[in-house]
Amino acid sequence: MQAYTYVEKGKFALLEKPKPVLLHERDAIVKVTLASICSSDLHIKHGSVPRAVPGITVGHEMVGVVESVGSAVTHVKPGDRVTVNVETFCGECFFCKKGFVNN
């Protein structure tokens, strides 16, 4: 599959990545049909997020279709259209160190 990827400071690229697999019973795999790049991704591009290392996929605001689910997943099923809330945080600032992510 292809994914928009942080390559190095100042550079994103569309790269080939392995297709994800279910690892845990609570996992779900979503085929992304639309994603956006927001200010969080731009902070990554400019090197302002220490935990963002080259190779991570960006574009965490997305919608898609559920492809598969683990045995403990009960709220969605394959074929459902979903939006994904992926919280990102730096882990370094006052708020993150106090457990208040996404502030």
Feature-to-residue mapping (PLM):
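Extreme N-terminal starter segment of soluble prokaryotic enzymes
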Residues: 1-2
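Short polar catalytic/cofactor-binding loops
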Residues: 9-11, 35-37
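Short glycine/threonine/proline-enriched tight-turn/helix- or strand-capping micro-motif at secondary-structure
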Residues: 10-19
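Short hydrophobic/aromatic patches on the structural cores and recognition surfaces of FHA
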Residues: 17, 41, 64
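Glycine-rich beta-strand-centered segment in the early N-terminal region that forms part
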Residues: 20-35, 48-97, 102
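Cytochrome P450 core scaffold surrounding the K-helix E-X-X-R motif
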Residues: 40-46
